[in-house]
Design a protein with these regions (language model features):
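Soluble "head" domains of membrane/secretory-pathway proteins
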Residues: 2-41, 66-67, 75-245
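Transmembrane alpha-helices and immediately adjacent membrane-cytoplasm interface residues
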Residues: 38-67
Length: 245
């Protein structure tokens, strides 16, 4: 349900509620001690309108739903899962390691991506035999689908802040450097990976991400992208209802 659809539904029930208040229904003799059907209906409508307004506020300013269209995050997220995404959190705190993040990628697409945050600014990453090492420590990753069968290679990229390229001395890692050797993530950048490592288009293809609203993208991409929010709950289907870790 979009905010506009929810608002239309609230307005519809509000009109019914107002109409029921214009001309009270007569109470039959001997029934003055019990609430009329009209009164009961009005109370239910009041409750629905209040709940709808609260929901409208939440989905407009705090959370949104996100539908999983692909298998890049299997087994954590299955195709057709529906998630709740906190759009409010990253306005005040930085994204954390292992967060499952929704964002617009720096490629020509109208669709959001969803990946896991593996590396943050200042982290040194190395990938060897399918194992990710962050600051010299092998990551415990029980969430991945299977051991990756490739060594990751970063694409050429430039980092843009407020539409201006960052100083190359700060922003650039040597072109197409292999992540089998340690590489330090530049300031303001994040390394995103899908849990289904062998079937995920992520940072090893299109570069780094920034929560501030820009991405470090390859020169052939030419589009900035931004974090939308932190995915925190699978709420559909009901048999998969749980908080994301």
């Amino acid at each position: 349900v979009t905010p506009l659809e929810l608002l239309a539904l609230i307005c519809f029930f509000a009109v019914i509620r107002v109409a029921m208040s214009i001309k009270p229904m007569p109470v039959a003799a001997g029934e003055s001690g019990s609430p009329s059907a009209r009164t009961v209906i009005r109370e239910y409508l009041d409750a629905f309108i209040v709940a709808g307004l609260v929901a409208l506020f939440l989905i407009t300013f705090v959370v949104r739903t996100f539908f999983i269209p692909s298998g890049s995050m299997i087994p954590t997220l299955q195709i057709h899962d529906v998630l709740l995404v906190n759009e409010f959190e990253y306005r005040f705190i930085k994204p954390a390691h292992q967060d499952v993040v929704v964002f617009m990628p720096p490629i020509p697409t109208p669709n959001d991506f969803i990946k896991r945050l593996i590396g943050a600014p200042g982290d040194t990453l190395r990938i060897h035999n399918g194992i990710v090492y962050r600051n010299g420590v092998a990551l415990d990753e029980p969430y991945i689908a299977e051991k990756p069968n490739y060594e990751m290679e970063i694409r050429d990229y430039n980092v843009y802040v407020d539409g201006q390229p960052l100083d190359p001395a700060v922003a650039n890692i040597p072109p197409k450097s292999m992540w089998t050797s340690p590489n330090t993530i530049p300031p303001g950048c994040y390394f995103m990976m899908g849990d289904n490592r062998n079937d995920s288009e992520d940072s090893h293809i299109w570069g780094f991400a920034q929560a501030s609203g820009t991405f470090a993208a390859g020169p052939d991409k030419g589009q900035a992208a931004s974090f939308t929010g932190h995915a925190f709950l699978i709420f559909w289907p009901l048999d998969r209802l749980h908080i994301l870790r």
